[in-house]
Amino acid sequence: MLQDTTDSESKSTIEVLQEVRSPLIPENAHVMTVLINHPPGAAGYPPHRLPGGPGFGYMIDGEMLFELEGEAPRVLRAGDAFWGLGGDVIHYQNANNRTDIPCSFVLTLFCVPGQPMLERVTEEELEERKGLRVTS
């Protein structure tokens, strides 16, 4: 949705890139914004969770293969906004979808003091939860 700014001197606009129902935000959470760069063909980070809460992202350059537990993998391109639940949801893929160019994205995360930003998922747990993964 494009916001109208014609009532002001400025010709600036505000474009809403994503709108999400308020996910659970943990008590005492702080917010961290990170820039992630993947070289061409990079596999990204191994399957993980965001223990502190949801993450909200914006693709700056390139393409990313993105997959969350319970959702089919999808390709995100420069200019796309995305988000993923925190807590127990597994983030399976954030790979560079291209072998010829890098990809980069900004991610804003809710974090809980004393917990890591990302928490890796074990092979055993991936096997236990394989029925929750959507493959197409």
Residue ranges and their predicted role:
Residues 32-50, 72-77, 85-90:
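Conserved short histidine dyad/triad with adjacent acidic residue
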Residues 51-71, 80:
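Glycine- and acidic-residue-biased ligand/ion/polar-headgroup-sensing regions
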Residues 60, 78-81, 106-110:
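Short, well-ordered beta-strand segments in beta-rich or mixed alpha/beta enzyme
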